[in-house]
Amino acid sequence: MAAKPFFRRRKVCPFSGDNAPKIDYKDTKLLQRYISERGKIVPSRITAVSAKKQRELARAIKRARFLALLPYAVK
C-alpha cells in the first residue's frame, strides 16, 4: 500500500475575510508582527499575506517608520 502524499495546507491571507484587521500605519502592534527582529519587512511567502495586502502592509510600515512610530533598524 502506497503512502499518502503529503500536501502542505495553503495558508490564507490574514487580512482577507469578514473580521480581518484593517492595515493602518498607526496600528504599530499589528505592523510589528510583520517586521523581523532586525527591523526588516517579512516576505509574504512566510506570512501568507496576499500580494495586494503585502503592498499595502509595506506602505503602512514605511509610513510608520517615516513618522517615527516604528524603527528603521533594530540594533
Curated annotation (Swiss-Prot):
Pfam families: Ribosomal_S18 (PF01084)
A GO cellular component entry from the record: cytosolic small ribosomal subunit
GO MF term list: small ribosomal subunit rRNA binding; structural constituent of ribosome
UniProt GO BP: translation
Protein's UniProt keywords contain Secreted: no
Annotated keywords: Ribonucleoprotein, Ribosomal protein, RNA-binding, rRNA-binding
Lineage: superkingdom: Bacteria
Keyword RNA-binding in record: yes
Gene3D superfamilies for this protein: Ribosomal protein S18
Family classification: Belongs to the bacterial ribosomal protein bS18 family.
Purpose: Binds as a heterodimer with protein bS6 to the central domain of the 16S rRNA, where it helps stabilize the platform of the 30S subunit.
Quaternary structure note: Part of the 30S ribosomal subunit. Forms a tight heterodimer with protein bS6.
Protein name: Small ribosomal subunit protein bS18
Species the sequence originates in: Ruegeria pomeroyi (strain ATCC 700808 / DSM 15171 / DSS-3) (Silicibacter pomeroyi)
Gene assigned in the entry: rpsR
